[in-house]
Structure formats: C-alpha cells, structure tokens
C-alpha cells in the first residue's frame, strides 16, 4: 500500500471516507488501495484535506482532463492534466511524466512551504503518479487525495462548477466504471 499522511494516527476518520453506495465501499477502497500501491504516492484522506482546504492551507492540483474539471471540481483547484504519453511512460517505465500546459510548473514553485499541495483525479491513479512526479520536480512533498474527487464528494466535500463557482451535486467520473462509487448515484461520465 502507498504511504499515508495519517499513518500511525489512531484517529480512523479516513475510514469514514470509504465512499459509495450500493455496498460497493469495500470494492472501491480495495481499488483505491491498489492505485496507492501502484503509484507509491503519499496519501491524504478527504476529511483531513477538507480541513486544510477550509483553513486556506491546501492547494488542489486537479489532474483530470479539462472537460472533467469543467463539469465539477473541488473549489479553487488548478488543472494540470497529464498527457496520454506521460501516463503511459510513468505507469510502464516509472518516469517520463508529461503534462498539457494547463498551469506552468513555475507557478506551483511559488506556493508557500506551509501550504500543502495535493493532487486529485477521479479515484487516485492519475493523481498518484502526478503527485510522485511533482514531488521530484518541486523538491517538496506533494500528496495524493486517496480516492480522488469521489472520496472528497462522498465525505461531504463541496464541488463546484469552476466557471460559475456555484455548488453542484454531481461528479464527473471519467468513465462508467467509477460512476457507481459516487454516493446517491451522482456520478456522470459523459464527454
């Protein structure tokens, strides 16, 4: 399993982040744990991330495609989408991540050290690889949101239409496979 920010913490509040409906919680958690293991990224759980977000001590890097982000996003998230080639390289040879030019890396280097940087995607795979890569590039810890925006939403985290900043009650799940894990059947996977 990947590293966790909360390892050794006797507060099992992240267990409440085991998200979804229809009895799929264990299945989703197993999948997310496998993503954590694959990427070797350091994890932060939704409740802890939400607390930092409320305190203004968190920057979310949304590593989903722009169309996913534009549908629903964690408030104030910045988009940095990996390319298909970058994802293929990093998942097969362990290096070579490439990004679409959504946000310059120089901008990320300006984030104060007392602010936690967290990558997020749908369920934690893309963002896990990006968190590991960005940790190296930025020479500082970059965490992965365990379970992605699905866990954030299921834990009661606010998601918004980033163009209007109005709260929405659905999450774009990239594909049909992940939609079933969003509480209340609020997963959308259209282009």
List PLM regions with ranges:
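Short, surface-exposed ligand- or partner-binding patches at beta-edge/loop junctions that are enriched
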Residues: 120
């Amino acid at each position: 399993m990947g590293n966790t920010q909360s390892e050794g913490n006797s507060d099992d509040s992240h267990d409440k982040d085991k998200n979804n409906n229809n009895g799929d919680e264990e299945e989703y958690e197993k999948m997310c744990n496998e993503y954590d293991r694959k990427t070797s990224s350091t994890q932060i759980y939704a409740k802890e991330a939400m607390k930092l977000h409320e305190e203004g001590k968190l920057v979310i890097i949304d590593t989903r495609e722009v169309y996913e982000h534009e549908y629903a996003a964690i408030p104030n998230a910045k988009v940095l989408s990996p390319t298909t080639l970058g994802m293929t390289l990093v998942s097969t040879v362990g290096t070579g991540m490439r990004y679409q030019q959504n946000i310059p890396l120089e901008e990320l280097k300006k984030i104060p050290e007392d602010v936690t940087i967290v990558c997020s995607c749908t369920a934690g795979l893309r963002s896990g690889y990006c968190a590991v890569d960005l940790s190296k590039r930025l020479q500082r810890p970059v965490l992965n949101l365990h379970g992605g925006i699905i866990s954030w939403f299921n834990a009661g985290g606010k998601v918004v239409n980033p163009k209007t900043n109005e709260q929405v009650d659905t999450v774009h799940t990239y594909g049909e496979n992940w939609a079933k894990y969003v509480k209340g059947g609020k997963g959308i996977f259209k282009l």
